[in-house]
Swiss-Prot record:
Source organism (scientific name): Methylobacterium nodulans (strain LMG 21967 / CNCM I-2342 / ORS 2060)
Superkingdom of this protein's organism: Bacteria
GO biological process: translation
Example of a GO MF term: structural constituent of ribosome
Name listed for the protein in its UniProt record: Large ribosomal subunit protein bL28
Signal peptide (residue range): none
Amino acid sequence: MSRRCELTGKAVLTGHLVSHSNRKTKRRFLPNLCKVTLLSDTLGRSVRLRISANALRSVEHRGGLDAFLVKAGEQELSQNARLLKREIEKKLAEAA
């Protein structure tokens, strides 16, 4: 399982830990990932995703998982999230 957000694509970054004497040692900046269960209003079921805390805030800001996925670009989404997006768009097209 990779350390990558399924919705925003945030991943591990690398950099330096710099000491007071300006010595640099390699370090990793890990994304703040959480396993979250989100409710899809369109599909009428809950979905379990591993997303960053920042992505969770973005989902709530946009008005839920469905609204977030409809607006999101395909490139940054994981394979699981892409399938969800297609399901939601198909369901919305049927309803319209």
